[in-house]
């Protein structure tokens, strides 16, 4: 019986990676096929997992590209951008940065492909439930909520969650939120 892992999905994703990184992904996938053909299922699985991890890291870096630059008077400190960083929440990818200005600071976090996004999806895709959290607003066709604490939460295309939390004024958080390429993020 053949092992139940999605080698096809990993191979398809490998076609989307950059050439330099693709070599390492291709090497891992070729090693997986060699091990599989030799009957070493454990090694085949390990190599497929390694290739999937590399692809996840590339995707996490892509997610980090949606973090906005700091506005005038603010600085941006790079945070964590990684795959599987949300182990306690079922894995997934995360990208975040901390923004610091005279009025305080805030952390902007993008999360995708994890159980927390799925769990929050029911709440953030329902306007009535969003209203119970705070003030519901729109950026184009995208709804988001400004919580009573002055934080911002949004769910993009039911797949990517944006959270902005911290001591900065809500106006600064909202201005940075509006700099995010929401249409591009919906296609991520």
Name each region found by the language model:
Residues 24-33, 37, 47-49, 87, ...:
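A short, solvent-exposed beta-edge/loop patch
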Residues 23-83:
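Charge-rich, low-complexity N-terminal segments
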Residues 1-9:
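Bacterial N-terminal signal peptides that target proteins for export
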Residues 61-149:
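Short, solvent-exposed recognition patches
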Residues 18-22:
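Sec/Tat signal peptide C-region and signal peptidase I cleavage site
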Residues 14, 51-59, 119-123:
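Generic hydrophobic, helix-prone segments enriched in Leu/Val/Ile
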Residues 8-16:
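Bacterial N-terminal signal peptides
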